[in-house]
Amino acid sequence: MTMYGGHIHLIIGPMFAGKSTELIRLVRRYQIAKHKCLVVKYEKDIRYGNGVCTHDNMSITAVCTPSLDKIDSVAENAEVIGIDEGQFFPNIATFCERMANAGKVLIVAALDGTFQRKPFSNISELIPLAENVTKLNAVCMYCYKNGSFSKRLGDKMEIEVIGGSDKYKSVCRKCYFF
């Protein structure tokens, strides 16, 4: 691939919106088309073992890393790079831009905001670099309308708390404040 063949597809939304499911679906299409694919996940996310796994147990093999800088040599051999939980990689924008300019297809799944509805600055930096941005919604777990936000259960205030339905609920605007 040349630098003109590379592009970035960013999939954003709250918890339980299907971001990882969409990432897996898109990567599998490239695998069927015989492209060399690499899937990357954040090392501290140990909820489902070494692969990227959805909340309904769909999975795909992945390389675990604490930093995208550590996978450069592996990424060089891939044509398509899928990155799950992109919000946890501080340098995701520079990594994706560099790889896309080298002709690679990047598919990134990430939260668009924290449980406090504040943006992840690294994802905000990636948006203007992406050719395609897909914003997914979940279902509000209280009123069953569209859920656009992630609400944390409990009183932990740090930003990086990895968990599933035991720690977070997807909520609509109204239910966010309950």
Swiss-Prot record:
Keyword vocabulary terms for this entry: ATP-binding, DNA synthesis, Kinase, Metal-binding, Nucleotide-binding, Transferase, Zinc
Pfam families linked: TK (PF00265)
One Gene Ontology MF term: metal ion binding
Residues annotated as binding ATP: 13-20
Active site feature: 85
Residue sites binding substrate per the record: 115, 159-163
Top-level class of the enzyme under EC nomenclature: transferase
Enzyme Commission designation: 2.7.1.21
UniProt keyword Ribonucleoprotein, yes or no: no
Residues annotated as binding Zn(2+): 140, 143, 172, 175
Single Gene Ontology BP annotation: thymidine metabolic process
Keyword Cell membrane listed: no
Reactions the enzyme catalyzes: thymidine + ATP = dTMP + ADP + H(+)
Recorded family membership: Belongs to the thymidine kinase family.
Full protein name: Thymidine kinase
Gene responsible for this protein: TK
